[in-house]
C-alpha cells in the first residue's frame, strides 16, 4: 500500500527501473551502451541527486564513462530525472518482449499514445491545399514558353499536331473558368491562350505541307503525294515518334487519291503497301533509330534547311491572293523537290529494291535509309535521281560518295581477310614444326641406349649391378696396388741380403 501513496511519477519510475533491471541478458532486445549510460545517469540523478563524487582514474574507463554521463545532467531535479527516465523507456517499449514487469509498467503509465483528430487533420490538409490550388492546377507561363522554345529548337514544332494545341487551349479556357477570383492567374492564362493561338497559326501552313495531299503528278516521276514528309525525319521528325507516323499513315490511307508510280496507276492497296513498307523495311524495332555514321548529321542539316526554305515559299504563296491552280502547281514543284531530297530520286519500289540490293554487301539495314530520308545510292536508279543529288545542299554529295566508301570498305575487308589467311598459314607452319619436333623426341626416347653411346663409352660402361659411380677397374686397381708394391719391396730386400752373404 506504500506504493499507492507515492506520487504517480515515482510509481512510473519504479516500474520502469524494474523493467530495465529484469531484462534478460541474452534476450531478443539488447539496448545499446549509450542507452544504458543514459538510463544509468537518470537513475543516479533521480536516486542520489547531482554528481558530487570524484572522477575515476584512467584505469577505470567504464567508471569514467558513467561519471561523465551522470555529471552531464548537472543540477537536474529528481522529478525531472524520473520523468526523463520513463519517457526514454517509452521510446523502446514497443520493441521489448512482453513480461510481467512490462505489463505492470503499462498499467501504471496508461495509454501514452498521442490521439489525433481525423476531422481536424482533414480540414487542415484541405486548407493547405486550397492555398496552392492555383499553382498546382495551372502551368507557369515561363514553363510554357520554355516548352515552346524547346520544341522550336528541336524541330518538333513543325510536325506537332494541331489537336494537341487545341486540347491545351480547351484546358486553359477551363482553367480560366475555374479561377476567376485570381486576376493575375487569369492574365497568365490569357497569355497562354494567345501563345497557343500563335502556335496554331504558325503550324497551319506546315500542317498543310505535312498533311495535304495534292493529286497532281510529281515532276521527277516519283509518288505524287507527300510521301517524303511522312517518310523521313528531315521534315517533321515523325519517324522518331511512332504515333505521329501512324497518324500520317492513316491520313494517307484515307486520302482517297490515285498514286502515279513510273507511269502506272495503282490502287489504294498499293499505296498502303508502299507506305507500310517505307515505314517498316528491314527494321529490328519500331522504337529504335539507327545511325550509320556521324556524317549523317551534316546531311540532315542540309535537308532541313531545304525544307525550311520550301515551307517559307509555301507560306508566301498561301498569303498572296492567287488561284487554286497556281498554288497546286507550286505545291507540286515543292513536293517534287522534297520528294527528291527525301528519297534521293527514287522511282518507286524498283529503285528501292535496287537500293536494298546495293546495300546488302555493306551490311547496312534499309531502315536507316527510310528513317533518315536517304534514298538509293545508285546513280542510275531513276530518271530524277541526278537532279536531287546535285541540288540537295549536302546530302547529294554524301550520297555520291557512298559508292567509293563501299568500295573502300570492300577493299579493307579483302585486305583483312588476306592478312588473316597469312597469319593462319604461319600458325599452321609453326604447328607442323612443333609436331615434328615432338615426334622426333618421342622416337629418340623409344630407341635403346646402346645405339646412342659411342664404342669407347660402351667399353667403359659400368655393369648394372655396380652401386658406385666409380668404375670397377678403378676400384680394383686401388685395392690391388698396395699388395703389389709390398711384394716388390720384399723381393728387392731378399736379393740384397743374398748379395751381402
Swiss-Prot record:
PANTHER family: ACYL-COA-BINDING DOMAIN-CONTAINING PROTEIN 5 (PTHR23310:SF6), ACYL-COA-BINDING PROTEIN, ACBP (PTHR23310). Residues 236-254, 266-283, 328-366 have a biased composition (Basic and acidic residues). This is Acyl-CoA-binding domain-containing protein 5A. Residues 173-405 are annotated as: Disordered. An acyl-CoA binds at residues 20-29, 40-44, 66, 85. Residues 406-437 form a coiled coil. It comes from the Eukaryota.
Amino acid at each position: 500500500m506504500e506504493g499507492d501513496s507515492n506520487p504517480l511519477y515515482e510509481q512510473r519510475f519504479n516500474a520502469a527501473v524494474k523493467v530495465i533491471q529484469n531484462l534478460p541478458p541474452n534476450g531478443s532486445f539488447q539496448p545499446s551502451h549509450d542507452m544504458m549510460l543514459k538510463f544509468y545517469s537518470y537513475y543516479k540523478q533521480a536516486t542520489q541527486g547531482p554528481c558530487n563524487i570524484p572522477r575515476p582514474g584512467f584505469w577505470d574507463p567504464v567508471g569514467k564513462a558513467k561519471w561523465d554521463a551522470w555529471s552531464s545532467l548537472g543540477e537536474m531535479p529528481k522529478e525531472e530525472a524520473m520523468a526523463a527516465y520513463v519517457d526514454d523507456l517509452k521510446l523502446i517499449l514497443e520493441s521489448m518482449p512482453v513480461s510481467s514487469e512490462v505489463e505492470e509498467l503499462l498499467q501504471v503509465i496508461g495509454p501514452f499514445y498521442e490521439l489525433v483528430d481525423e476531422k481536424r487533420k482533414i480540414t487542415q490538409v484541405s486548407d493547405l491545399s486550397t492555398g496552392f490550388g492555383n499553382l498546382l492546377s495551372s502551368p507557369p507561363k515561363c514553363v510554357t514558353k520554355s516548352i515552346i522554345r524547346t520544341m522550336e529548337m528541336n524541330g518538333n514544332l513543325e510536325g506537332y499536331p494541331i489537336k494537341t494545341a487545341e486540347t491545351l487551349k480547351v484546358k486553359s479556357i477551363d482553367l480560366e473558368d475555374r479561377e476567376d477570383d485570381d486576376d493575375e492567374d487569369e492574365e497568365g492564362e490569357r497569355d497562354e491562350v494567345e501563345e497557343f493561338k500563335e502556335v496554331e497559326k504558325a503550324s497551319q501552313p506546315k500542317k498543310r505541307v505535312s498533311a495535304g495531299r495534292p493529286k497532281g503528278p510529281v515532276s521527277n516521276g516519283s509518288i505524287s503525294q507527300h510521301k517524303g514528309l511522312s517518310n523521313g525525319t528531315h521534315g517533321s521528325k515523325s519517324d522518331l515518334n511512332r504515333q505521329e507516323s501512324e497518324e500520317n499513315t492513316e491520313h494517307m490511307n484515307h486520302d482517297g487519291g490515285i498514286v502515279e508510280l513510273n507511269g502506272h496507276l495503282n490502287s489504294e492497296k498499293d499505296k498502303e503497301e508502299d507506305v507500310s513498307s517505307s515505314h517498316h523495311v528491314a527494321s529490328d524495332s519500331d522504337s529504335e533509330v539507327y545511325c550509320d555514321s556521324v556524317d549523317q548529321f551534316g546531311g540532315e542539316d542540309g535537308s532541313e534547311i531545304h525544307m525550311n526554305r520550301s515551307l517559307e515559299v509555301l507560306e508566301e504563296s498561301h498569303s498572296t491572293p492567287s488561284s487554286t491552280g497556281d498554288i497546286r502547281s507550286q505545291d507540286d514543284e515543292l513536293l517534287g523537290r522534297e520528294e527528291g531530297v527525301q528519297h534521293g530520286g527514287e522511282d518507286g519500289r524498283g529503285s528501292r529494291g535496287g537500293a536494298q540490293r546495293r546495300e546488302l554487301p555493306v551490311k547496312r539495314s534499309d531502315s536507316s535509309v527510310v528513317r533518315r530520308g536517304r534514298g538509293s545510292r545508285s546513280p542510275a536508279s531513276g530518271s530524277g535521281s541526278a537532279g536531287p543529288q546535285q541540288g540537295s545542299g549536302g546530302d547529294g554529295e554524301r550520297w555520291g560518295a557512298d559508292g567509293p566508301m563501299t568500295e573502300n570498305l570492300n577493299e579493307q575487308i579483302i585486305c583483312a581477310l588476306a592478312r588473316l589467311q597469312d597469319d593462319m598459314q604461319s600458325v599452321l607452319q609453326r604447328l607442323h614444326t612443333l609436331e615434328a619436333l615432338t615426334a622426333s623426341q618421342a622416337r629418340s626416347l623409344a630407341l635403346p641406349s646402346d645405339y646412342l653411346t659411342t664404342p669407347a663409352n660402351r667399353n667403359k660402361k659400368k655393369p648394372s649391378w655396380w652401386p658406385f659411380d666409380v668404375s670397377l677397374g678403378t676400384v680394383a686397381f686401388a685395392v690391388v696396388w698396395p699388395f703389389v708394391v709390398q711384394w716388390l719391396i720384399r723381393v728387392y730386400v731378399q736379393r740384397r741380403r743374398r748379395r751381402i752373404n
